[in-house]
Regions:
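Soluble metallo-hydrolase cores and metallopeptidase-like ectodomains found primarily
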Residues: 32-34, 123-148, 236, 241-320, ...
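Bacterial N-terminal signal peptides
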Residues: 10-22
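Noncatalytic luminal/extracellular "stalk/propeptide" segments of secretory-pathway proteins
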Residues: 29-34, 53, 57-194
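Active-site-adjacent substrate-binding region
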Residues: 196-209, 213-216, 220-221, 226, ...
């Protein structure tokens, strides 16, 4: 912990410089002494940056079922325990395990170049050796019969299963710099290419799903060398990386630029050769768990306030914003509350769910395993939208929950009242994030929205979602906001009614307790 303290001290010095330019405390904070202390502890002694270095840089990627995620679970328990907060890892099932090693992808003909790319999650490796092979582009077929007839031509090849983009410049760069006619032409070309490739995949009778899907399995059966794909995000240098269910043929994602290079060489019959050396280990079904931290309630210990953020992440980078940012916010909020409100009226839980990226698996399991928590839930605040300041809260279809939240917000410092827009009663959530398994049961669980910071381009699910993308001023502010809201929810004398707004309520989905393939 000595290194953590040294980093914390450097971060506190920087925070002190920033605070010199902030309005005085009396101008920021309400006269409620608890709110004042939350503000002081959260703003003056934040541990967000050293925690981020530990989670993102040292522990790193947290794919569900991986050793990295288990290490993060254990780190959370150890860290909470050091703060005097009870925490546990609660197992709910198993998921396919996988250990990511190094990825080396080279173009070796007609010229040499090391390519920017990485394995898809759960990809098999190359068995400790170089595998060199030619490439082939998945053609357009009339129907699945023609696809099956073509398969022998793919044997022993790396198969390209995505379009080569005509440009890797983001749309906003075209809008800012191209002539209107040129920008329109490029936009039309991109749209046509997307539609043509959608039809190309559908004609095979299979699907890529969220990676290689059932099509990948069929290509693997045909004896291919591997699958090459690309999912650029319309940002500079970023691409998304998801999953494969193949167990023999490796699957890799390349950057827009390097995929385009290989695609054009293949299209032009330049006979490119790729050499791959991929280290990976398929581990079979592995135990998976949520990490739950608890500050016990005093007077209403069977009523609950939940601070919610999923811990798992796609692992092309370190999952800093999706959803490491939410993890840090909830950890910091709990640390602040333990110091300021060690004996809240209601029990305050931090739920660090796993399996969110596989379909809200951990949070669904917890809601099934703990009906008493769902029944006694006063409020859940769920964070899953990156590093930005919380600037909106989505409704949950519960009028009484909306009324209480409006009251709580009205008692917060002016800076938060001006910053956070509440959407009112709204509609219940059908499954976008970890609040949904609670909200579908009629419990007050809401998603927090954040300032954008180009989240879709450079953060969620991409190869660039790393420590340096986190805005720690916003993390510090959000932790204070969440601690204040948890305090208000915990101490409110009234328990929130389950009366629902008119309309159709989404059905709850069961939690899979072991790997459930997504092939279509």
């Amino acid at each position: 912990m000595a290194g953590l303290r040294q980093v914390a001290w450097r971060c506190l010095v920087a925070a002190g410089i920033l605070l010199l330019s902030t309005p005085p405390l009396h101008a920021q904070v309400s006269r409620d002494s608890i709110l004042q202390r939350i503000w002081t502890v959260g703003m003056d002694s934040s541990l967000a940056e050293p925690l981020g270095r530990a989670l993102f840089d040292s522990l790193g990627p947290r794919l569900t079922g991986s050793p990295g995620l288990r290490a993060a679970n254990d780190w959370l328990v150890k860290t909470y325990t050091s703060w005097g907060i009870t925490a546990r890892n609660e197992r709910y099932g198993t998921w396919r395990g996988w250990r990511r090693g190094t990825t080396h992808i080279d173009l070796v003909a007609p010229r040499t170049r090391s390519l920017e790319g990485t394995m898809l999650g759960w990809s098999p490796g190359t068995g400790g050796r170089d595998v060199t092979a030619g490439t082939v582009i998945l053609p357009h077929f009339k129907d699945s019969t023609e696809f099956v007839a073509w398969l022998p031509q793919a044997r022993g090849k790396y198969v390209l299963v995505a379009p080569g983009q005509p440009t890797c410049r983001p749309t906003d760069d075209w809008t800012a710099n191209a002539t209107p006619e040129s920008a329109r032409r490029m936009d039309s070309l991109r749209q046509a290419l997307t539609a043509e490739w959608r039809a190309r995949i559908e004609a095979t009778g299979y699907s890529l799903a969220l990676g290689t899907g059932s099509l990948g399995l069929r290509l693997e059966q045909a004896g291919i060398a591997g699958i090459v794909t690309s999912r650029p995000t319309n940002g500079w240098g970023t691409f998304q990386v998801f999953e494969t269910y193949d167990t023999i043929a490796p699957a890799v994602a390349l950057s827009c630029e390097d995929y385009g290079l290989v695609y054009r060489l293949t299209e032009d019959n330049r006979h490119p050769q790729l050499r791959m050396n991929l280290e990976a280990e398929l581990l079979g079904e592995q135990p998976v768990a949520n990490t739950i931290a608890t500050i016990p309630g005093s007077k209403r210990k069977n009523e609950y306030v939940i601070l919610s953020a999923h811990l798992d992440a796609w692992d092309a980078a370190s999952g800093a914003n999706d959803n490491g940012a939410g993890t840090l916010i909830m950890m910091e909020a709990m640390r602040i509350l333990k110091r300021v409100l060690p004996h809240p009226q209601r029990t305050i839980l931090a739920g660090h769910w796993t399996g969110e990226e596989q379909g809200l698996v951990g949070s669904r399991a917890f809601s099934e395993d703990h009906p008493e928590v769902v029944k006694g839930l006063q409020f859940m605040f769920n964070h899953d939208l990156g590093t930005g300041r919380v600037n909106r809260i989505h409704g949950a279809g519960l009028p009484d929950a909306a009324a209480h939240l409006e009251q709580w917000l009205s008692r917060l410092p002016a800076v938060f009242q001006e910053q956070v827009k509440f959407e009112g009663t709204g509609q219940p959530s059908g499954g976008s994030s970890d609040h949904a398994p609670f909200n579908c049961q009629g419990a007050p669980a809401m998603l927090l929205g954040s300032a954008g910071w180009d989240y879709g381009k450079y953060d969620g699910h991409t190869n660039r979602d790393s420590y340096d993308k986190v805005v720690y001023d916003d993390i510090r502010s959000d932790a204070v906001l969440l601690a204040m809201l948890a305090y208000e929810a915990s101490e409110d004398p009234a328990f929130i009614s389950r009366e629902r707004a008119p309309g159709t309520w989404p059905a709850c989905q069961p939690a899979p307790r072991h790997t459930r393939p997504r092939l279509r």
